[in-house]
């Protein structure tokens, strides 16, 4: 995956052990969050758009190609804790990722971890930059002095790529991550 804009498979030296734990935790984030409190997922936006240069690079398409974008906020005990942005090429959505078209408020994990044809790439993490598309949605739910911590991973099904990026908001770090680390 493209490592521009600060994204890397290696955690920045400034991250704490707790942050590294959550940014590189394997498996379903939905399951991990559900163990910490009352979990809910709220769709923020789902649309077709023209791929910006960064999205095009991640998906292996030309800039301005049609892509599908889904943005959600995940809440614990009614507090926004994680924002997520998923992207796929329009062609991939029409073929290999067709089940995602009407997914609404269901977590993507329900299909990503039950299909043996889906292969997950290693995580990348970043301190989000203001020009990152995930930063825009994250700033709607939290203002932070420090850059938000985020992770992303590509899921590939029969050659079609879906990229899921997740930003852990300050409310997550202060209210849930450390207090319940042992159970996660």
Swiss-Prot record:
Keyword DNA-binding recorded: no
One of the protein's GO biological processes: pyruvate biosynthetic process
Primary localization class, coarse: cytoplasm
Disulfide bonds: none
Pathway note: Cofactor biosynthesis; ubiquinone biosynthesis
Alphabetized UniProt keyword annotations: Cytoplasm, Lyase, Pyruvate, Ubiquinone biosynthesis
Keyword Acyltransferase attached: no
Subcellular location: Cytoplasm
Residues that bind substrate: 70, 108, 166
GO CC term, one of those recorded: cytosol
Domain of life (superkingdom): Bacteria
Catalytic activity: chorismate = 4-hydroxybenzoate + pyruvate
Pfam families, per database record: Chor_lyase
GO molecular function, one term: chorismate lyase activity
InterPro entries: Chorismate--pyruvate_lyase, Chorismate_lyase_/UTRA_dom_sf
EC nos: 4.1.3.40
Its biological purpose: Removes the pyruvyl group from chorismate, with concomitant aromatization of the ring, to provide 4-hydroxybenzoate (4HB) for the ubiquinone pathway.
Similarity comment text for this entry: Belongs to the UbiC family.
Protein name from the UniProt record: Probable chorismate pyruvate-lyase 1
Organism: Burkholderia pseudomallei (strain 1710b)
